[in-house]
Amino acid sequence: MVDKDNAITEGQNAERLLKDPLLIKSYEVIQNDIFQQWIRTEMEESDKRESLYFSLRGVLTAQNVLVNTVENGKIVENELRGGK
């Protein structure tokens, strides 16, 4: 039960983070900065573009971890309430 309670709590915390205006703005600024750097690269700077791509993937992965944590918490909470 502790693991399920923990999953619910983590899900609620992740949801709070995803709704936090500062975190939302931070993700937007980081993603925009990466994109702006990417579009300013020269044709021969493929290594730089690749590095920027992986940076963006890292940011998106962090967001996805939070989204998945929210969803997992909701699933566990629904199960405990007798839902399907």
Question: Where do the language-model regions lie?
Answer:
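Short, structured coil/loop segments at alpha-helix boundaries
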Residues: 1-2, 20, 45, 59
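Amphipathic, hydrophobic secondary-structure cores in small proteins
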Residues: 25-65
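N-terminal acidic leader/helix
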Residues: 2-40, 76
